[in-house]
Amino acid sequence: PGKELYESLGCIYCHSQQVRPEEFGADLLRGWGRRRSVPRDYLFDDPPLLGSMRTGPDLANTAQRQPSAPWHYLHLFDPQITSPGSVMPSFKFLFDVTDEEPRSTTDAVQLPESYVEDQRWIVPSQRARELVGYLLSLDQKHALEDVQ
């Protein structure tokens, strides 16, 4: 479900999921992966979401670079908090804002004190959890001996 949400929200229009070889850019120098992406990385993706735009960073290995679900929730809620100057839109509609304390406060998004608009709780919806689950599955760290 997270992959379908990634597609339906149009994330693919600004993010690619392919670490390009050195001769095509600085992906490896940027730390977007330990190696370039190869066809085997997409063997079980249907469809593979390679993308071509780089308005935002490549997400092929976002689970390596940002393995924290709370970071992703915060970034989706308001990208300006985690990435000042980002052109990514806010996905606040994926969160429930409530006066009721969640079952576990670890379920709530922890906003910086300087940002807090009010004292209500911001809780990721099921859709937000699915999207973050998908983002945390994007990891091409497995070694491929024949790939440099």
Labelled PLM ranges:
Residues 1-4, 49, 62, 121:
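Short, charged/polar micro-motifs that form catalytic or ligand-binding hotspots
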Residues 1-17, 31-34, 148:
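Sequence/structural segment immediately N-terminal to covalent heme-attachment motifs in c-type
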Residues 6, 42-44, 134:
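Aromatic side chains
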Residues 9-12, 57, 129:
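Residue-level detector of short, conserved catalytic/binding motifs and their immediate flanks
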Residues 10, 19, 136, 140:
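Hydrophobic/aromatic-lined pockets within catalytic cores
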Residues 16-77, 85-104:
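Gly/Gly-Pro-rich "capping" loops immediately C-terminal to redox-active cysteine motifs
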Residues 67-148:
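C-terminal capping alpha-helices of c-type cytochrome domains
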